[in-house]
């Protein structure tokens, strides 16, 4: 099981995932036109983050002289070489798709990207006048010579490298102008007076083009020889010595500020940039040639997300209104609904509103005594945090673990943590050495029979915005066995993290890997007795070597294993004698597949766990994660049916072969787009009323 050929490199597997995202833009029949643009933007943003975190980490290993090989047999240097080759190929595919297909198709729909040089002189004059008024005051020209140090360039900044000639002295100079991130990257010409406002014909101009045309205003005594675009990506991973941190909040604030100064890991340049300017940047940014990427066209494509604001419904996905079974029947009493039986929702097909309503109702209910909750990514305008603040202000006991180390959400979470503290909530910033990624809410309510505990347990964040875009399960219960263990977990989080006696919950870093492998081994034993055994797992990533090896053992024993893995998968299915009984698919579609579900047939007494944990070392060892059991057999069957539907997808699913390559699933079975099927079923259910609907939504 230690043979490197049995495994796929983690970093390359992630790049293969992002290639599947890009394919949603490339394939013309998959999405409306503007939605295809969205996938170009998502692909580009994903790749930026990959360099900021993953590539930066491997670069540090190389700098430290580390040559330890990954489980698939690659050294850090070898990984960087393969990453570079794959990224160059993917960027070419992206630009071919954008410039050769999508932009011409948009132009045919009256949405055009224009070049300044192609505009009539009258319109150029209007734009130049607008530049002087709206852009020029924001710009800062920065010289580089013996009297001016090389200018600092922030992470993800788009810049212009300018060659200047002193007219009087004939000396060649260099300067830099940053394209302001506070201004829209795409200038909508229809909104500029004097350039027309025909809504049927929208024109966009990259802001950097307009700046380049007006550089003479910034350097009035010099001749502009040439200007070239370039873009910087820096190491954005925050290193925190938590054992030495006296105040975690202040330490993370300092770390967020330091993110601007991380080492440069990628320099994007235009191919026309002359060698001496290229070398000047390489030398002063202290990078190597392998960090430089030549990119035709505009640099930094995540800004294309701005096009989603265009009001052209025919070029976008048809709006979907999620099903909310409480709309007519809840009567404001979600607690009675939970008391009548466990509730399971599948977002975004089921509305996220009941989750918000649960917290809001708990905050306003005079019989609710306390609310405890974990928060990881909640968004910038969170109704859930506002409800918690309302609860604290009304005198309820409110305890909230706000994970300050949630990457790229640190500043937002710091703001919410302070706001909660200001109204009297008990706020925990996280645990030393661990990120708390679990999704838990515990509400204690006074009722005629005594105090009663209500739970919301989820696979996704407490964020209504992502609740419309990510597929996740929400589970409501008043089960005392689960409530007791969740109470113990909250006490461990707010006190000292030492409790280990969980019988029902799987809690990382305590028992998740151990219990998952035990359940795999149980299927192996059952398969050997009866030639049966079935495992279905759905997750974002499968990386953990010990779990992969357990799955290989299960396959060799005859257990039938189906894995739905959205992103990274280091397991190779279909290898004779090793993994021929394992199938791996990945679904990429309108919604981001985000739920985690682990189903074990258990000889006819199936067990199902849902929760926050992927099968990665970081989730099993370095985070507080939870997987919770679903006891209701009807709900277990419902989730199994969800998984089987996804496994039958032959329109949006990809499969991985024994060689580690991904191909689209294509067969002669009836066509199935699982996400569309879930939406269609909810649309058909919208006239259904009554709590019984919770058992038959799928």
Curated annotation (Swiss-Prot):
Q: Where does Mg(2+) bind?
A: 377, 407
Q: Respond yes or no to whether keyword Kinase is given for this record.
A: yes
The gene that this protein is the product of is: ppk1
Per its record, the protein catalyses: [phosphate](n) + ATP = [phosphate](n+1) + ADP
Annotated GO biological processes are:
polyphosphate biosynthetic process
| Identification of the protein by name | Polyphosphate kinase 1
Q: Which GO terms describe its molecular function?
A: ATP binding; metal ion binding; polyphosphate kinase activity
Organism of origin: Chlorobaculum tepidum (strain ATCC 49652 / DSM 12025 / NBRC 103806 / TLS) (Chlorobium tepidum)
Q: Which family does it belong to?
A: Belongs to the polyphosphate kinase 1 (PPK1) family.
What PANTHER family does the entry give?
POLYPHOSPHATE KINASE
Keywords, alphabetical: ATP-binding, Kinase, Magnesium, Metal-binding, Nucleotide-binding, Phosphoprotein, Transferase
Q: How is it modified after translation?
A: An intermediate of this reaction is the autophosphorylated ppk in which a phosphate is covalently linked to a histidine residue through a N-P bond.
Q: What does this protein do?
A: Catalyzes the reversible transfer of the terminal phosphate of ATP to form a long-chain polyphosphate (polyP).
Query: Cross-referenced InterPro entries, in alphabetical order?
Result: PP_kinase (IPR003414), PP_kinase_C_1 (IPR041108), PP_kinase_middle (IPR024953), PP_kinase_middle_dom_sf (IPR036830), PPK_C_dom2 (IPR025200), PPK_N_dom (IPR025198), PPK_N_dom_sf (IPR036832)
Q: Which HAMAP family match?
A: Polyphosphate_kinase
